Amino acid sequence: MNKANLLHIDTNIKITLLAEVSVGISANSILFIAYLCMLLGENRHKPIDLYIAFLSLTQLMLLITMGLIAVDMFMPWGRWDSTTCQSLIYLHRFLRGLTLCATCLLNVLWTITLSSRNSCLAKFKHKYPHHISGAFLFLCVLYMSFSSHFLVSMTVTPNLTSENFMYVTQSCSLLPMSYSRTSMFSTPVAIRETFLISLMALSSGYMVALLWRHKKQAQHLRSTSLSSKASPEQRATRTILLLMSFFVVFYILDTVIFHSRMKFKDGSILYCFQIIVSHSYVTVSPFVFICTEKHIIKFLRSMCGRIANI
């Protein structure tokens, strides 16, 4: 991809990308602040709330980093040096991988939380809250090692056009790598993503079975003239299934666009589309939490009421 072409991409694409980043930053900030206030408040909170706060913070940092990269792609105010390129691209890749793993673990933890007492997962219910901090630390160390090659493969974009460099932004490019070296870095990533997607598929399948069982119970309750309102378990199950549906759709689109880019030498527009699609989930997911979690809605309403009374 020619570095000059990024500056001449259609204005609508630039606006879409920057708007997506801005909306995502705002939504994740609201979600993180809401959960942080609930965690620091006197009200009792669920152990999984801490993990949702961690996920929203990770997504917020990812979008902020992407915003800085997007500015250098379209509106370069000054060339970055090699250290800035390596640090920002490394941080972005690290946060992107960490977000994927955190989403997967949130799915698994939610499955454990909603499992019945007779389920084989019930024995983990009282164990996982005590291991969340350790899981955070393990994930950070793991994904720091996964992304470490960007510290040595990222360099300042040369002034002269070269087909051997892969342009990331106006200031940063990836150094050319041999096929064996590329495979050495890409294989662990492929294995990681395959494992995480499979784990999410299994937990989502369990969720579907759980939702079907609750639906049968609801039909029985209606037949006995009892309340037919959705239970907290049903609402939580629908929330996580909705999140996973968004994740799968955006992941498939991202994969299709990535392979399409590989077929074109000058895929600047596809490159921007891939960035938009790959960050769509982290932009949409906080809205799912905000709109479906009743305690978040109540908290935001109370905050708005306090602000209005000031």
Swiss-Prot record:
GO terms for biological process: response to pheromone; sensory perception of chemical stimulus. One of its GO terms (molecular function) is pheromone receptor activity. It is a multi-pass membrane protein. Pfam families: V1R. It is found in: Cell membrane. The keyword Phosphoprotein does not apply. The chain crosses the membrane at residues 21-41, 51-71, 94-114, 132-152, 191-211, 239-259, 269-289. The keyword Calcium does not apply. Belongs to the G-protein coupled receptor 1 family. This is Vomeronasal type-1 receptor 44. It comes from Mus musculus (Mouse). The lineage of its organism: Eukaryota, Metazoa, Chordata, Craniata, Vertebrata.
